[in-house]
Structure formats: structure tokens, C-alpha cells
């Protein structure tokens, strides 16, 4: 399949004459409709459809298990979020929600009553939605389209309990991109529970995403290679079967990404597999070893039995060690690029019996543009680029020119951050997906990564949802409209308080301009580098704390406002608390340095020295407060982790908290001891013993006596 097929798909689904009504963008009622993704064509009508005890859902095809599931899913949602009980089937009702395939006679009759011309063909995922005073019709070309129409209908329900209603309107909608995916890193720390993966599937399907990929280095519980998958931290076959069946009901294809070249250190560090490593106990499989291909064949034989579907994702990115070890001579003779592409083709040959389309990351291929022609045309390039730039054409064009299908793969920018960098993620996703659509890309895969092992997926729903909108809608995503719609679509909350908090927390990495915020959070404060940075960032630190505290206050006050996805608010609260503590830590270190140096240079002023300990708010107390705050944060982080993930790997993160707690307590004990000795010796330890570094320039210059 080539990109021309994707363009055909887009042309076929973009028939503007599918219905006799036109999109009226200027209509005030239309402008007030808040749904994500936004519909291609929407015409707001008059009146409303009241939802009550006399409302029934009717299946145009009573034998359709898929439609029955979609109907029950809608019933469960409106009961939970709007407090409305809607029944499925039963006697004829005064108000009816009719669902089914668009070609069924009963659907055709209902659309005729609603004056909707359904004579043109939709794509398989497209749907028609008509809301009248007494009848709602949700019809898809297939059961998938009907399901997506009901996801839109969920967002259209307004009011609660006896006052619940759906505003009158007509919608025709279809996706711009065939595949709309999320990749979740489950190999470098967090490994989600089965229940949480189900939450991911449900939420992604709600926003019309149709693919979820597991990024795996060593976290597949392989029966043929049981040493590799960690106990308690791997996806087991029974779990995969359960998840595949669950995802099928939500029309989400689960795609395994088992690395087949780089990123395999967790396997290659084992002595049993050491001979397969390009460099000793390294990261890259050696293409010189036949056993490398035996390992790949064994893994994918099992994965083929567990994951039905069209795709395997074989990874193949960041093979930094290639040509430095066992393949050094071959790389010297042929070039590293040639060795890479030979391996890529050999993996394809190993997996050919499974008749899957193979996805692979495109970064190495872009480094060898002259060799891109060696990529078989049936493979799919997963073209990842995370820079927030205005134009991605130069990254897309080489693969398009080679006649290769590709996914554009932006990122949620959650890696190494306390909360995702929303500014970078928004620009990356919106522009990359736009340019991918223009080039006829087969799909979009939005990526989340756990590079430092502590990222929490629950914090990343804004960029994930934004990717869903960008890939379903056509052209440049209107970010302002997306933000206007976000609180209602995601939280079922009026207003924009939650999206404002999202931008406040997501803007802190830009405000600080200090690299990754996780790294800053764990940086040793008792170093000259940290203290100099703290002084340079004093104004920004204050701004960060105000943003974090305002966000936290709003989240506390509005906790009950959200009727959907309230779990996300807990992750946002944790991020706000961590940012506030980080700012507090910076302020404490500045105060500690200033006051201790002042006391050290004025040892004869006993009142000044004693202020370090003997009054409320003294630095001695501040040091202990840091440990106390970290203890509270540690517990909050533990709870948030376990709400998403298995216990596996958690202790390695909590150990970071423990280490920093001990550091602050040790400093407070050292300060206590130093001040006690001062009473008899009139001396204090050199500030360097407390890690205070060079003397602050504003500190009085009186020499110590």
C-alpha cells in the first residue's frame, strides 16, 4: 500500500455533498457546541431533545452485538456524568435514540423523517448524527462509525438529571487520517495495570483514537525467554488476551512494539544473552550473531499468537553502538547505514510469514537519506520528531519521495518533566500532524516516554487529546477553539478553569528555562551550581510558586465540578505540589546561604548567630520543613503511581525521595550540632561544610572573628 491509497481515502471521505445541509460556522448555536474532535460538518437546529425516563435507545439491528455494546456504553456514561437513566429497548418510547448502520431500512426511514439526505457514501469510520425534538439518529457506515457517533453524542448531552437534554443539530463527520494512535512507554519505569490500560483504551476511544501501541524493550513476559521479563513488571499472555478482547469492543487496535535492534540493554545485560550484544552488555543486538534473529523470531512468534491485527512495530531506533563492536569490520567496509538497513531487511524476512505490515522508527533512515530506497515499500516509517517547529516538511519529504507509507509521530513532551511541556507539545503535535496530512501520511502516533522512570501517564491527557483532535480534523488545528472545548469535552465541566491550570503547569518548564524539571527537582541543592542558579532564578521562582499555588487552590475548590476524568485532577494536584515544593526549596537555599554566611562573617554578634535556630521561621526549622514536605510528596506520588501502575519499579523512585529526605535531616542535625558548639567555642564550621559554596555578593564582608 502506498501513500496514494491514503490520499484516495481522504478524497473519498471528504465528499462535501454527503448531506443536504451545510456547515454554518458563523451560526451562534454552532459556535457554542463543544466537542473534541470537532465535527467536519455541523448545523445547529432549533429546539432540543429532552432525556428522561421515557427515553429509549433502539437498535436498528437487534442482532448487532457491537451496536448493543456501544448503546450500553452510552447509557453507562450518561448515568455517571449526567445522572440520567436511559434504557435499551422495550416498548415504543415518546423519545427514541435510534442507532445502527446507515444502510438499514429503519435508519433510512428515520433520516428521511429528519430531512437528512443520506444518499452519499461515508468512510467506514464516518457517521451521521441527527437530533430532533422526539428522535435522535446515530448512524455509521459500519459499527465503528456508529460507535464514534455515540462518543460525540455523549459530549452533546447537557444539563443533569431531569434537566438533561441534547441540543437540536445535524452532524456529518469522518476522520481525516486513517490511523490515530498513542504509543505508551511501558519499559523504563511505569508498567500500567490491566485496569489502567483499560482506562487508556476507553478514553482514547472516546476521542476517536483507534490504535494503542505498547513500547516494550524487556517487559513482555515471553514464555520462550522467561529471564528477560521482570517479575511483576511485564505484560503476561493472559493479560494481553484480556486487553485485546477489551480493546476490540472499543474499536482500538493494540499493536506490540517489541524492540529488535537498539534499546535492549535489559536483555543483553544477562549473561545468557551477552554474546548477542554489539558491545559487551550493551544496548544493541549484534547483526553478526545468528542468535539475534533467533531471539527476534521467538518473541514475535508469541506476539503473533497474542496480538491479532495488521501491524507489528519493530522499533529499530537509536542504534548508537552499531559498528563499534562485533559489526565494526563490516561497518568499516560497507558503512554503518548499510549494516543497519541489512538488519532491517533481515528482520522483515524473519517476520514475513506473519503477513503483518512492519512499522519502524525513521530516525536512522533520515541520517542516511541516500539509503532510504533500500527500505521495502511494504514497511511503514514511524517518523518521530519532537522539536517544536513551524514546518516539518523536510522530515516528511524524504519518505514520501521514496514512496513509503509513514506515520507522523509527535510527542506529549511528558518525559523528564513534572508536568508535560504544553507549549512544546501543542506546537509539535498540531504542526507535525498538519504537515503529515498534507503529505498523505497514513496516520499519527502520539508518543509518551518515561526516560527517567517517573513520568505519570495521567498527566499527559491534554496532549493525547490534542493529538486525537489534530488527526481526526483536517488542516491546521485551531488551538484556541480546542482550549475552549477542552474542559467540557474532557471533564464535562463548564468554563475553562481546568485548561487554564493545564497551561499554567505546562508552562513552567518554559518559565524556568532550566531544562527538564524532573532533573531540577532532584538536583543536589547543596552545591554552588544550584545556589547560583537559585539566585539567578529568584523572580521566576516566585512566579512559579504563585502559578502552582493558584493552580492547586483552583483544583481543590473545583474538585467536584468535573463529572468525567476526575482522576486527572489528582495528577495535576501532585504536579502543582511538586512545583511549589521545588520553588520553596530554592527559596530556602537562598535564605540558608545568605543567613549562614552573614552569621559566619559576624561570629561576634551572638544574637545574629542564634537567629539561625532560636526563633520561628529560622533556617534550622526550614531545613526540617523540607524533609517534612518531601515525606508528604512521597506518599502523594506513591498513591498516584499505584492508581496507574504496578508496584514494580516504584521503590526505585521512592528511594529518590528517601535520599533527599535524609539529606535535609542530616543538614538540620549538622546545623543543630554546630549551633550547640558555638555556645562554647564561638565558632561555626566553614560554609563549605554545609555545601554553601561561594559567599553571596550581597553578604556583609566583615571577616570572621
Regions flagged by a language model, labelled:
Residues 12-24:
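Bacterial N-terminal signal peptides
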Residues 35-38, 43-44, 122, 129, ...:
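Substrate-binding groove of N-acetylhexosamine-processing glycoside hydrolases
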Residues 66-68, 221-224, 264-266, 322-324, ...:
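Extracytoplasmic/secreted cell-surface and envelope-processing proteins
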Residues 102-104, 260-261, 318-321, 364-367:
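Short, internal active-site loops enriched in acidic
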Residues 29-177, 431:
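Contiguous, structured surface segment used for ligand recognition
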Residues 2-15:
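Bacterial N-terminal signal peptides that target proteins for export
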Residues 77, 115-352, 359, 408-410, ...:
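Feature activates predominantly on carbohydrate-active enzymes
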